[in-house]
């Protein structure tokens, strides 16, 4: 028997002594544990109650289903039914499909909104004074930084996932169901999952453990809820992610590609990001032809990823894809099937608090609804 008291400086060592933290061996089989000892909760209402959500707290959502999302409306409807008030809604973005939130703002269920974008009737009503408190808009990278720093504290994150196992390993697609719903990358959800006090994964497709590969690991998930409907993947490719045939937008795209080339940024091993919007997405088509003509390739493409970028990767024109959001179903399929199509978090993508992938870009093509160009100041 070792006499601990005789060991020199023993009292300067914290938590010294025999280890008493060992748990009794669980002799149940894997199948039995998966059935009985998991994170599955019988209903959304029960999961909400278990989180301890209270009036005045902050709830978050991702927008990877874009205009096909059904999670936000379903959850806020339930919260209203349960009597919650004065909640802050912190979604990574809000689309036209979220117009039903208007009545929940009018009824005091939602009193604050923090997001990165807002469209449709909800945006129109907010612009006309629907909500008393100013809406906080952040860039996607700014939102990730605010969550990481604690400026945006999330009490409960409600994260829709096209596949999840009983322990919470969740992903934006399923390898067990070729025909199932898919949204591709869960990049914006990953930051919420990491820093939220409570995380509820809502899925329509429960798979056996382990759901590998996963976007969100089980140790970041508190509860898993099964539902019949999380969203319509056809809504992913809508509005800002459309393919354009507009002659004006095509002219803008062609000109942008020419400017990139003339500026010296189209070289062998360059890096790029293509944003949403018809002209922005069309620019990739013109760049592709220039790359083929000049026999050059792109080292990596970043950001919201389209099937067009995925096709260029499969052609060998792009070495790596860093995907924070899949803009269409072809991109989601590529993420599932292509080894060098990587899923990244919003923090990895563009947080100013850490070294981010945007810092390595040669150029970015983005589309804006409105640009104000002022006259230069004359002295």
What positions do the PLM features span?
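Conserved alpha/beta enzyme-core scaffold
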Residues: 1-374, 378
């Amino acid at each position: 028997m070792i006499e601990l008291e005789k060991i020199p400086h023993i009292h300067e060592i914290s938590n010294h002594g025999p280890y008493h933290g060992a748990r009794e061996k669980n002799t149940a089989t894997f199948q039995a544990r998966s059935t009985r000892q998991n994170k599955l909760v019988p209903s959304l209402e029960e999961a909400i109650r278990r989180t301890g959500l209270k009036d005045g707290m902050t709830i978050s959502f991702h927008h990877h289903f874009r205009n096909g999302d059904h999670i936000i409306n379903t959850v806020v409807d339930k919260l209203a039914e349960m009597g919650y008030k004065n909640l802050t809604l912190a979604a990574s973005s809000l689309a036209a499909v979220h117009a039903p939130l208007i009545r929940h703002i009018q009824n005091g269920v939602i009193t604050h909104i923090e997001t990165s974008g807002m469209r449709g009737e909800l945006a129109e009503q907010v612009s006309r004074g629907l909500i008393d408190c100013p809406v906080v808009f952040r860039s996607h990278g700014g939102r990730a930084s605010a969550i990481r720093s604690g400026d945006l504290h999330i009490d409960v994150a409600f994260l829709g996932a096209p596949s999840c196992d009983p322990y919470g390993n969740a992903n934006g697609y399923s390898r067990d169901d070729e025909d199932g719903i898919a949204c591709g990358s869960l990049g914006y959800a990953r930051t919420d999952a990491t820093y939220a006090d409570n995380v509820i994964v809502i899925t329509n497709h429960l798979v056996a453990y382990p759901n590998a590969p996963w976007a969100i690991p089980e140790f970041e998930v508190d509860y898993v809820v099964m539902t019949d409907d999380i969203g319509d993947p056809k809504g992913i490719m809508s509005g800002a992610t459309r393919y354009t045939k507009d002659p004006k937008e095509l002219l803008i795209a062609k000109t942008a590609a020419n400017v990139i080339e003339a500026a010296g940024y189209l070289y062998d091993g360059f890096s790029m990001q293509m944003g949403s919007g018809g002209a922005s997405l069309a620019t990739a088509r013109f760049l592709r032809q220039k790359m083929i003509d000049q026999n050059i390739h792109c080292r990596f493409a970043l950001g919201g990823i389209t099937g067009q970028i995925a096709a260029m990767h499969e052609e060998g024109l792009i070495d790596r894809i860093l995907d924070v959001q899949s803009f269409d179903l072809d991109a989601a399929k590529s993420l599932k099937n292509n080894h060098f199509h990587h899923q990244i978090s919003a923090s990895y993508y563009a947080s100013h608090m850490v070294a981010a992938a945007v810092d390595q870009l040669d150029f970015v093509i983005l589309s804006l609804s409105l640009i104000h160009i002022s006259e230069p100041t004359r002295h």
